[in-house]
Amino acid sequence: VYESIMKLYAEQGIIRFKVPDDGKWSLLVFTLCFSGGTIRGIHFGEDDGEPFAPLSADLLNPDAVSAFIEITHERYYDVLKEYFGSTVIAMFTDEPCILGRNPQKGLIPWTDDFLEWYISAGNEEISLPALWTDCGEKTEQIRRNYRKALDSKLEHAYYRQISEWCEKHGIALTGHPEKSDEIGLLKYFHIPGQDIVWRWVAPEDNKGIEGEHSTMAKCSSDSARHRGRRRNSNECFGCCGPHGIHWAFSMDDMKWYMDWMFVRGVNLLYPHAFFYSVEGEKRYGERPPDVGPNNTWWKYYNLISAYIKRM
């Protein structure tokens, strides 16, 4: 139980523990390590599970995020500054994940100064075992407190910095967080958004009105309304074909998804995707379908674009 947790201290490099009773005790040691998580690279051989997939960065570290902005956003601005605010209207951040993709199992997000951040939010260091083990009735509340502190750290280190950079350079921050129901993390988005993907929302099986993902469109529209933002967005249609056959995604499917989002207050869509080419297996299978020139119903797309434009 929570009340039995004790913090041990090293004396001359040695930690000693004398069992106080005949009960069963566990000794827990917490270690800060790399997650081993990756991101999806832009070249062949750099996707999930592939040998050259780039390692993910520490999104909770403001210095790491600052360096990221310097080598990416600043570079875009150096080359395209004359188009910022006109042709270039926003920067898109796409489901940033703290641990990265496919991290080591059993880890939770952390960074060098997170313990101080966690304690400053009103939590106790001695509560940390509850993040891994059941410590009684306080366990769920401790985990909620941890998640709240984690989200605020991510907001401060990552989203806030990028949002301020975008505002300073005359463009918006848009895109979406990692998970469907993370409405709180939309705080710093000038155009808050979500991602309709993998047919998690669909006309069949009540997927449009039940479950975690059914809140997506309302997350973005409510975030915009509460914060006085004019636009809110959804990336949509990626891997949304029926029965796992994503190239079977039809115009009827597209119409259903658009109506589902529009009726919930979404007023800006990012259709996924318009590919330069679908030649070859890796391109053909890269998060289909193509809703652009490589699709058989491209000649009718003006009907879709006009419908989107009216919203």
Functional labels for PLM-detected ranges:
Residues V1-R144:
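Mature extracytoplasmic enzyme cores
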Residues D78-A90, D94-P192, V197-M311:
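Carbohydrate-binding surfaces of carbohydrate-active enzymes
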